[in-house]
Structures are given as C-alpha cells and as structure tokens.
Regions:
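Gram-negative bacterial Sec-dependent N-terminal signal peptides
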Residues: 1-18
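Low-complexity, acidic/polar, glycine-enriched regions of mature
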Residues: 19-198
Length: 198
C-alpha cells in the first residue's frame, strides 16, 4: 500500500525536469529587420526595441510557445526624415499603435532545428493569423554562466494586409513602394535565473 504514495512522490519530484523553461528575450541582442522595394532599389531598416518570452518544452516541443512585442517608435532606417515618416499615420502610426505584437497558438517541429509557428500578428490594430518558419540557431552558456538560445524567422508580409497603404504613383507608371516586405527576426533569449539554477 505504500508503493502508490511513493510512486506519486517520485512523479512529483521528477515533474520540474519536464516543465517548460522560460527564456526572456535579450533586447540588446535581438532585432527585427525588414526590406522593401523603393523605386528600382530596396530600403532596409530595423526595429531595435524587441521584447518577449519563449516557453521551451523539451519533452513536448509542440507545447512550446512564444510571445513578443516590438516598439514601433524604435524603427531605424538610418535616415531621420524617413524614420519620422514611418512613425507617422501614413505608416505605423506609432503614437496610436505603439506596439507590434505576436502570440503563438501552435507550434510544429519540421526538422532537427526547424519549426512552423502559427499565431496572431497585430500591426496597426489589425490582427492576422499567420504561420512562419522558425530556425533554432543554437543553445549555449555565455561567459557569465547564463543559458541562452537563439531563433531566426524569415518571412514575407504584405503591408496592405495591415492597413499600411501609403504610396505614390510614378509618372512612368507603377508605384514608389512595393507591397511585399521581407522580414528577418532574430531573437536571442536567456533562461530565467531561478530556472537556470534548478
């Protein structure tokens, strides 16, 4: 009769080893880059203020989750006049829409270090369900003993889907800006201290 309580105690003792681990996005080493066509060339920029959390479930990867937000005012294309325009109501309307957010709803492993992540992306108050490929860049301890993990997302978004419509018609035909935006999101995250100590 004592076997059942003992078994239950062993299961409870082992549970933390299989619990999801929380990693906090390192803002200093994470960014969201984008590229869009401008006339016959391309403009590349980035958002420098990215924060969020990643729940890593090693026993059941499909139960892992990610949530992050990007401050729209942190946009940087190395040109102040252009950045101010991008923050204006013509584009991201940063004053009224200070954040771009994403919250995952489903995750599926597609390879050794690759995943498909589905979730809700909200830009300018417009929420869309999207699925993006995610690559695990690696895991390691930094020189200070912190456990870190890195992920990369590469995808393409149509800005019109999020009500970013501003453009200029060219005399020769066509438009000043393209609609498709190539996105490269790099996240480096560090395990929460209390979990790293377990």
């Amino acid at each position: 009769m004592k076997a059942k309580p003992l078994l239950a105690a062993l299961i409870l003792a082992a549970a933390p080893a299989f619990a999801a681990e929380t990693y906090t996005v390192d803002k200093v080493h994470s960014n969201a880059q984008f590229t869009i066509r401008h006339l016959m060339s391309k403009v590349t920029g980035k958002f420098t203020d990215v924060e969020g959390a990643i729940q890593v479930d090693r026993a059941k990867p499909e139960a892992s989750a990610v949530e992050f937000k990007i401050k729209t005012a942190s946009i940087d294309t190395a040109n102040k006049q252009r950045d101010d325009h991008l923050r204006s109501p013509d584009f991201f309307d940063a004053a009224n829409n200070p954040e771009i957010t994403f919250k995952s709803t489903k995750m599926k492993a597609t390879g050794k270090d690759s995943y498909q992540v589905s979730g809700t992306l909200t830009i300018r108050g417009v929420a869309k369900e999207i699925t993006v490929p995610v690559t695990l860049l690696g895991e390691m301890k930094d020189p200070w003993g912190n456990e870190r993990v890195g992920f990369e997302v590469q995808t393409t978004l149509n800005r019109k889907d999020y009500n970013i419509l501003w453009n200029k018609t060219l005399d020769a035909g066509g438009y000043l800006l393209g609609d498709d935006v190539a996105v490269n999101l790099t996240l480096e995250a560090v395990k929460k201290k209390e979990e790293a100590a377990k």
